[in-house]
């Protein structure tokens, strides 16, 4: 066992820091791919340009050719890795999706309005749809980043399909979302209640008196003896996003028997709907809002360290998932055989602190979570704990599947654009971990703020140039000792993808 796991550690940790080619998947390569590999459609690259962009030595930074081809004058830039993988395994998509109301039968997204092709996206001045169209449905804006590992297959599939899964969750709740004056009904078809209502209950005493609302009373809804939760409208959108992530992951699982869908991916998306931004994250990409010179975090990273207790608890409840080769307990270092019977510091799923325990034979097994920081791995294999795909991922040279420990559930945070006025310099920055591995939030704040301050506020290219500047700062300059950034620090050798989304455009749409 030790030799096998040691082999996994050596092959994985030695040279592939972010975990890409070192992951062991068993998906059949003789199957056709679901979607051909490409770069984001909105970049408008020719096949020759895509080939030239894959230069691991020069690492050219790609930006939008036409700024008006993304909503809200959104800026975007990307760069390939320094040789970690053949392709840039990041993927990005941006859509404006119109969803029809459900009427009798299941409705589906309007194919023409869902912007499947990049050229159909409206520019920043043409986002508002006709009133008669909005009566029949609802429109949402969508930005997404997918950071692939062990191949770009899952990232490509998710970039093509996730927004459709979101749209499929919306038809049933369109009228409810539009009517913010009343609470969402507990059951569809019930009469909605005003949000100013003090209670959604009927006391037993009132029922026995035959008052308004009692059984037989002509004026009232059905009797309820128990308090009902008041569900905010935004929770319906959060639930729709959570279900869309789940369905996307299940779809990848189903289709991998028909198509070759390599690896897995993290997913960071933003949905603008009815005046609010919904940021959903599953993985280690990051989103921050820069407003009035301040940072508002809009996501959390999900790694073996941040999700240690969840992973340990699952292993505690289902020890068979460990294949009799791993221990769910954490120790400050690997336990040695000579330490059996001694007292050593340890940490279990129920603990944030540490305690001492007597070392047993079982503690000699390899730890479920191995390494620290960016080197932390689940079963010495993968460094992210949430995302899409990875259904075939196994521990090296074993039959132990890692997918049971990985979750597709995103964390969703909400930002109400209507509650704030925004200047031309207030932005939402989305980026894959290639940026955040080398730049702190404060460095991104300083870079974006200073760059935009020196740009014409009316220049629509300013956000693309700001995204390009961030990528350049994270990639650095190639020197004798590799890619270097400010203060001669090591630059990012990972794929880097960045959106810079101006928030004042959201106020205009609202």
Curated annotation (Swiss-Prot):
Keywords assigned:
Cytoplasm, Hydrolase, Nucleus, Protein phosphatase
Gene Ontology molecular function: any one: protein serine/threonine phosphatase activity
Q: Which domain of life is it from?
A: Eukaryota
Catalyzed chemical reaction(s): O-phospho-L-seryl-[protein] + H2O = L-seryl-[protein] + phosphate; O-phospho-L-threonyl-[protein] + H2O = L-threonyl-[protein] + phosphate
Disordered as annotated region, ranges: 105-128, 188-225
Family label: Belongs to the PP2C family.
The molecule here is called Protein phosphatase 1H
- Organism encoding this protein: Xenopus tropicalis (Western clawed frog)
**Lineage, please?**
Eukaryota, Metazoa, Chordata, Craniata, Vertebrata
| Chain's gene name | ppm1h
